[in-house]
Amino acid sequence: MARITAEDCNKIIPDRFRLVVLATRYAKLLNYKVETNQIKKEKRDKPPVISLRRIAAGKVSVPQLEQDLINSLRTSSMIEPLVNQDESEDVEEKFEYLPEVYIGEDYSDLDDQIFINENGEDYETDK
């Protein structure tokens, strides 16, 4: 399989690294797309072999495959900026259910604690 098919593919795609990337992409497309009629005829071969054979036979459009690969690698999720202030106000309203937290200045939980002063000496807090 590999040597003869790869040598045939080198006539169409001379760079072996590029060939590997494009053949891998086409093999993945064969796995995920519905091409069961053609794959049933070539059932004994796996998708990578089928993709190499189709590339060697010229049945695959290499520029189209390259464009498909580039499109698959692009990130399609871009952050959209807020258009108006009403949307940001809606976010603030969603957090109204949170309870308010009171932070007091009562240090009673620190009673009976041992602290170190600036001189490095231990001292206990007095009430």
Swiss-Prot record:
EC number per UniProt: 2.7.7.6
One matching Pfam family: RNA_pol_Rpb6
Catalytic activity: RNA(n) + a ribonucleoside 5'-triphosphate = RNA(n+1) + diphosphate
GO biological process: DNA-templated transcription
Keywords: DNA-directed RNA polymerase, Nucleotidyltransferase, Transcription, Transferase
InterPro entries: DNA-dir_RNA_pol_omega, Pol_omega/Rpo6/RPB6, RPB6/omega-like_sf
GO cellular component: DNA-directed RNA polymerase complex
A GO term, aspect molecular function: DNA-directed RNA polymerase activity
UniProt KW Nucleotidyltransferase keyword: yes
Signal peptide range in chain numbering: none
Domain of life: Bacteria
Subunit structure as annotated in this protein's UniProt entry: The RNAP catalytic core consists of 2 alpha, 1 beta, 1 beta' and 1 omega subunit. When a sigma factor is associated with the core the holoenzyme is formed, which can initiate transcription.
Reported function: Promotes RNA polymerase assembly. Latches the N- and C-terminal regions of the beta' subunit thereby facilitating its interaction with the beta and alpha subunits.
HAMAP family, per database record: RNApol_bact_RpoZ
Family: Belongs to the RNA polymerase subunit omega family.
Name recorded for this polypeptide: DNA-directed RNA polymerase subunit omega
Source taxonomy: Bacteria, Pseudomonadati, Pseudomonadota, Alphaproteobacteria, Rickettsiales
